[in-house]
């Protein structure tokens, strides 16, 4: 068993976070906001009193992503897998753990299927990038 590659954890989290900025910005930002009832005026106005400030939302999102990446890094350190297995583990986290958990919540909240696919695909693509970082940093 080796040590967790903390550089890969930080850079992998950063890669996932940047993908999220692109994903929920130019790629799918407009339909995502519409399905969540967020108007352009609301975005421009910023958080209302009683809502979390934007900096806190971003920080917590980054830390939650880092927690997932740290767990993946721990699994990689414990098993010392081949590169293709690292990618299978990373994509598996997104497709088989995070996506079903998200799906359960979306079903009970009666959220649109299109919104589910946008969010679930973000997890899968983001974690594939994380897997790539772990492979690159060996």
Per-region residue spans from a language model:
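Juxtamembrane/disordered regions of integral membrane proteins
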Residues: 1-138
